[in-house]
From Swiss-Prot:
This is UPF0585 protein CG18661. Belongs to the UPF0585 family. SUPFAM superfamilies: S-adenosyl-L-methionine-dependent methyltransferases. GO terms for molecular function: methyltransferase activity. PANTHER family: UPF0585 PROTEIN CG18661 (PTHR20974:SF0). Pfam families: DUF938 (PF06080).
Amino acid sequence: MSLTKRLLHIHPRCSFSKRSHPSADRNSQPISEALLSQVDKTTENLQLLEIASGSGQHAGFLAPLLPNITFQPTEYERNQFGSIAAYAGDCPTRNIRPPFHVDITRDPGDWEAPPAPASYDYMFNSNMMHISPWSCSIGLFRAAGQLLKKGGRMFTYGPYAQDGILVPQSNVDFDRSLRQRDASWGVRDIKDLKVLAAENGLQLEKLVKMPSNNKFLTWLKL
């Protein structure tokens, strides 16, 4: 059964049309370069879990570049499943699985499709932490601590402060606008994320500065 048919059987009201976000189009190249430089591109049957896949664009442009890695998209908003499936269906390497629902604030054992502990080589999360409550960041690192294999890596992308300093002014303005929209949102400080990492058996391994004042962070599972 095709991916689309399988997902349609589970979610009969899905609309299988690609959604496109300009920001994902813009950051696809730099994210690809940062991720490809840090993953194993030869070992077969590696597994990557993406948290908050959104439209599915990231998996859509990354998976064909890494045919040895199987991508598992997840998303809280079920109305995104059709778009994710559309990107997966067009993937020439056929290494994107059907998405499943994840509330990242919940323990992985309570997810709709609970993964086995230490079952993933990689995790990836883009542009979630600043537009979600702090409880989502807590849950993200908890999931990484439980689901990554020893020596596995979680990659996170987005705007971040460092040791209480947020630059440039455009990021300061962006943070202010986020908090005005929702007091629980806001650009996260890497020093606070390091605390979450340590609590879950991870450490910051690498920081790559990206275009548009974003950063690509690599978290190593110890």
